[in-house]
């Protein structure tokens, strides 16, 4: 049954993405952001697909960890998010969602038959995962790995190769699903790539 209600700020839950190459500090930054949102480590959960990297920052506080155990299917991610919601978490960090896309690409590559037609077996699974994130009644921070390359930059009169992050390793257009997308470089500088503007009254 449909009903109408006045808008309230407490109804708005942020869906934030942090992207960067390995070593840029995505997990650490996500934890600090999550604590800034809730001020309670016990209300933060990290869904870990990075082989235990979530535990590297246990000195920050006693947050919760859900290990995906090597199963990076969208269904396992959805189950993990539901588990965190039911446990009363206020901020869920999904670290990282790139493994889910890698899983789906591998799944697609191993299907028999027409490659284009086979996307019909992949897209609904990805869409279900995305909708789970967007429809969750809690704040969600997702990390995404970026493809890496090297560029030459001048440093002290010499040309030095520096590693840079390029495109996020996820489905094209995934960045448009989030309220905010932040790119973190290896010097830990942050740039907003996508931002839904919310005007102050």
What annotation goes with each model-predicted range?
Residues 1-9:
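Pre-Walker A adenine-sensing motif
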Residues 8-87, 91, 98-99:
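Conserved P-loop
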Residues 55, 190-193:
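Short active-site-adjacent structural elements
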Residues 91-172:
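P-loop NTPase motor core
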Residues 140, 179-183:
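Short, well-ordered beta-strand core segments
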Residues 184-189:
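Beta-strand-loop-alpha "switch" segments that mediate conformational coupling across diverse proteins
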Residues 194-201:
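Residue-level detector of conserved catalytic or cofactor/ligand-binding positions
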